[in-house]
């Protein structure tokens, strides 16, 4: 198993340098690779829900949450249908932790859309715990950056509605 991505293409070096300098509280990723650890080497890394349960951190700043596992720990990977089913059944603490993070901090989803099943599942778990007025607060903290194949496309900002259903 290869534990790291190949060195990024030189044409992205400026963007990667800027990314490393961002003043962010943390990273939540479903990726298994070590890109985030290399970009933010001083951040504490938590792999899956088990590490979160026993972490001593109460700060929630400077942390990387690898919610679908890490290549350095193959047993932690969420990759099969059975893994995802198990993940969804057992993610109560993770959902609670994410609720806190999502409400208290702006969240930028890079490379995901509201149509991504993983994002839908996480947001559904969170929304089910909130009153309608709190859902509005949550909405204001979520930003999605998506890649558009059309190189001539203009930048768009869209609002996504999250509704609570009984």
Residue ranges and their predicted role:
Residues 1, 64-67, 79, 142-145:
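Generic structural hydrophobic/aromatic packing signal, biased to beta-strands
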Residues 1-56, 72, 78, 86:
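Active-site periphery "cap/insert" segments of enzyme catalytic domains
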Residues 9-17, 91-95, 120:
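Short, well-ordered alpha-helical scaffold segments within catalytic/effector domains
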Residues 22, 42-45, 52-61, 72-74, ...:
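SIR2/sirtuin-family catalytic core signature
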Residues 27-30, 66, 109, 144:
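A structural signal for short, well-ordered beta-strand segments and their strand-loop junctions
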Residues 32, 69, 112:
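Active-site metal-binding loops of divalent metal-dependent hydrolases
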Residues 64-66, 73-90, 94:
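Glycine-rich phosphate- or other oxyanion-binding loops that anchor nucleotides, phosphorylated ligands
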């Amino acid at each position: 198993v290869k534990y790291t991505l190949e060195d990024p293409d030189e044409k992205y070096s400026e963007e990667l340098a800027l990314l490393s300098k961002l003043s962010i509280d943390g990273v939540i990723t479903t990726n298994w690779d070590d890109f985030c650890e290399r970009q933010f080497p001083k951040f504490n890394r938590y792999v899956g829900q088990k590490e979160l349960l026993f972490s001593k951190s109460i700060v929630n700043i400077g942390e990387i949450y690898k919610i679908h596992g890490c290549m350095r720990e193959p047993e932690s990977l969420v990759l099969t249908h059975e893994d995802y089913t198990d993940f969804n059944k057992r993610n109560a603490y993770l959902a609670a932790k994410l609720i806190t993070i999502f409400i208290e901090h702006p969240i930028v989803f890079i490379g995901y859309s509201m149509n991504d099943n993983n994002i839908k599942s996480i947001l559904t778990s969170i929304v089910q715990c909130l009153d309608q007025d709190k859902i509005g607060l949550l909405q204001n903290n979520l930003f999605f950056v998506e890649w558009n194949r059309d190189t001539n496309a203009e930048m768009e900002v869209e609002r996504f509605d999250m509704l609570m259903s009984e």
